[in-house]
């Protein structure tokens, strides 16, 4: 299972890098990272700084260059931008903030922050972390990584029941019973998120959650990316990479549980 964890760490970073990469091309924040705050100055500059920081953290994790520190800083960055960016925007600015769908874009960033903390928890301890107040604080957030990730999974599962028609339209035409699979997928996300949060048969439930998202990657997200690679600032490609990061997060949780390491 250690091999699964190591491979999944790399996969998480590839997915996250694939999500932020298009931002440099479009000089705009992706739908999942920062909302359209009115009158925000120097947007291309902030986009560049954020993207470079995320890519640098991903490279450090993949090549094990102060990897735990990089993962902690990555998780802290994503969580801070979610709280002060998307969460605040959705709470005070968004017109339809009483609809769960309004919060859906930002929830991906929350899940990615949780994934970064899961990655940090899967890496060996780093003595340099104890020398920094910020890193010591971020290290205390590691146990909340699975909760952040699973909260998004549960809420996305609920979206399958609230927005059945548009979500069922994502099911490929060659698969019969679109409505059934929409409800099934929503139920599976809710069940997976709850069981992983409660650590019920954690190695099995987290693995099945990751496997389900991986299957969706191949039968839903990749075909959509091929059909419309550049629409809405390459949103289909970004969604495919987010699915890659999400399944990697679930596999890391599963691998750590199987190795009887704290998650």
Would you name each region that the model predicts?
Residues 1-28, 32, 44-56, 62-162, ...:
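Extended, low-polarity transmembrane helix blocks
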Residues 28-41, 163-176:
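Short juxtamembrane and helix-loop transition motifs at transmembrane-helix boundaries
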